[in-house]
């Protein structure tokens, strides 16, 4: 129950992973330092989101938080690192779509939502068979959940509750994971052969998801999210310093 106004139940989860082109590189380094060094010494830019639209900014924000937590460095240092790769490999004004760059091979790695697996390795994908997946080299893995909700004032609560129960049943969870690449919310399905065959990334992030209840919850309300987005846009447009932008992150993430 949320504020006694509606009821919500998770139906699937996802997390960020690194997809890589097996025809370009053999494996992904096990640390962020290794990934960064590989990018610095090759023609491949850091596998991160590069645009400045609202959706891009939100992806970039989560990437920055994840990299910062994994490497144990400050927000200011993370922002400088992120910006270095954007400026070295991309033109922000005319940036290449990250997924498109990955598909054509100008990027060897792509840091993205695990549910992208279905899109990248589907029957209509030009790169099917050349896509592998690796877990992020993070100490702290972010796990996101997707939920269905019903209004507490609904006149069809019983039917809605039955539907939520159906969506959380084992067979529906298996089909949902197979068809969408979402991670099931039922832990015993992490070893399900059908799910692993359709989504091999589930095995690689199994431990992260199983331990997710012990992780701190990162919650950013709408007002703070807007402030973070505005701060990042100013930083990437060279209108603000990494120190000041990092301070905004620190203040709003407390």
What are these regions (language model features)?
Residues 108-113:
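Paired acidic/hydrophobic, glycine-rich loop segments that form the ligand-binding mouth/hinge
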Residues 33, 90-104:
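Short helix-initiation/N-cap motifs at beta->coil->alpha
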Residues 123-183, 213, 233, 237:
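Extracytoplasmic/periplasmic substrate-recognition and gating elements
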Residues 1-22, 47-49, 132-140, 211-217:
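A structural signal for short loop-to-beta-strand junctions that line the ligand-binding cleft
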Residues 23-25, 116, 171-172:
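Short, well-ordered alpha-helical scaffold segment located
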Residues 3-11, 16, 33-77, 107:
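Extracytoplasmic/periplasmic solute-binding protein
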Residues 207-254:
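Conserved C-terminal helix/tail region of periplasmic/extracytoplasmic solute-binding proteins
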Residues 70-96:
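Glycine-centered hinge/linker elements that transmit conformational signals in sensory
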């Amino acid at each position: 129950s949320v504020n006694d106004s509606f009821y919500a139940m998770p139906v699937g989860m996802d997390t960020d992973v690194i997809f890589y082109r097996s025809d370009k590189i053999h494996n992904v380094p096990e640390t962020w330092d290794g990934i960064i060094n590989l990018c610095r010494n090759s023609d491949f830019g850091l596998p991160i989101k590069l645009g400045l639209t609202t959706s891009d900014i939100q992806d970039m924000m989560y990437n920055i938080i994840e990299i910062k937590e994994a490497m144990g460095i400050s927000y200011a240092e993370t922002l400088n690192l992120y910006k270095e790769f954007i400026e070295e490999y991309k033109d922000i004004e005319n940036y290449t779509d990250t997924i498109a760059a990955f598909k054509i091979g100008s990027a060897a790695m792509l840091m993205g939502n695990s549910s992208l697996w279905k899109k990248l390795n589907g029957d209509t994908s030009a790169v099917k068979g050349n896509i592998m997946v690796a877990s992020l080299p993070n100490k702290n893995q972010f796990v996101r959940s997707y939920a269905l909700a019903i209004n507490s004032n609904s006149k069809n609560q019983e039917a809605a509750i039955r539907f939520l129960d159906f969506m959380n049943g084992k067979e529906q969870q298996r089909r949902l994971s197979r068809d969408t690449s979402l991670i099931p919310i039922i832990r015993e399905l992490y070893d399900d052969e059908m799910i692993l065959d359709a989504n091999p990334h589930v095995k690689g992030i199994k431990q992260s998801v199983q331990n997710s209840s012990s992780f701190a919850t990162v919650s950013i309300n709408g007002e703070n999210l807007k402030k973070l987005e505005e701060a990042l846009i100013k930083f990437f447009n060279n209108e603000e310093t990494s120190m000041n932008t990092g301070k905004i992150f620190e203040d709003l993430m407390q």
